[in-house]
């Protein structure tokens, strides 16, 4: 009988497919965020995760790029698309901050400072660890911020504007594919990094998965109420 730890013949194929699915999922997510931001005249990703994400893509796409043939082009494509997301956010975020005039008047400055601060954070992690380790921990930080930030943005707005089921699923499934890829590499000894055997890593994964699942539940609840309200309005 084949030992359970022996790498299957299809290992590389599965890992590459999962990596590609993750990259495509996030590309689709950025495209949809830009579309819904312009359609609904709002921003789809909350401000701090947006700053952290684009800073991560800038650092690991330009300042400290991966030597892997596929990884760098994917990150650069994310960076280009995310610039459109940031542009839409700066253009339409004042619509969401009428209750806070000080923030509303200085949103471009706040985005600039936020991106600069997050860039410094990612660089500091590289200086503390090696680039590959910092790459993973920075990505985990971005993922946790994005998932929790998205959930609380949805709760605060009490509205599904700027979002959709496809937008949510592209992010969620893209991230899940990335986790499955890393889990396979860890299981078969192809990764030198701690994964599910590390408590902090396992906690971060659990935290963003729970947050993203709750996002789907809350989105469904809000969308159902919106559709019911629209139906009543038509009936009147």
From Swiss-Prot:
Enzyme Commission number, as recorded: 4.2.3.-
Pfam families (UniProt xref): Pyr4-TMTC
Subcellular location: Membrane
InterPro entries with a match to the protein in the record: PaxB-like
Pathway membership: Secondary metabolite biosynthesis; terpenoid biosynthesis
Record GO terms (molecular function): lyase activity
Entry keyword Transmembrane: yes
Signal sequence segment: none
Membrane-spanning ranges: 13-33, 45-65, 70-90, 106-126, 135-155, 166-186, 200-220
Top EC class, one word: lyase
Keywords: Lyase, Membrane, Transmembrane, Transmembrane helix
GO cellular component term, pick one: membrane
Function: Terpene cyclase; part of the gene cluster that mediates the biosynthesis of anditomin, a fungal meroterpenoid. The first step of the pathway is the synthesis of 3,5-dimethylorsellinic acid (DMOA) by the polyketide synthase andM. DMOA is then converted to the phthalide compound 5,7-dihydroxy-4,6-dimethylphthalide (DHDMP) by the cytochrome P450 monooxygenase andK, which is further prenylated by the prenyltransferase andD to yield farnesyl-DHDMP. Further epoxidation by the FAD-dependent monooxygenase andE leads to epoxyfarnesyl-DHDMP.
Family statement: Belongs to the paxB family.
Protein name as annotated: Terpene cyclase andB
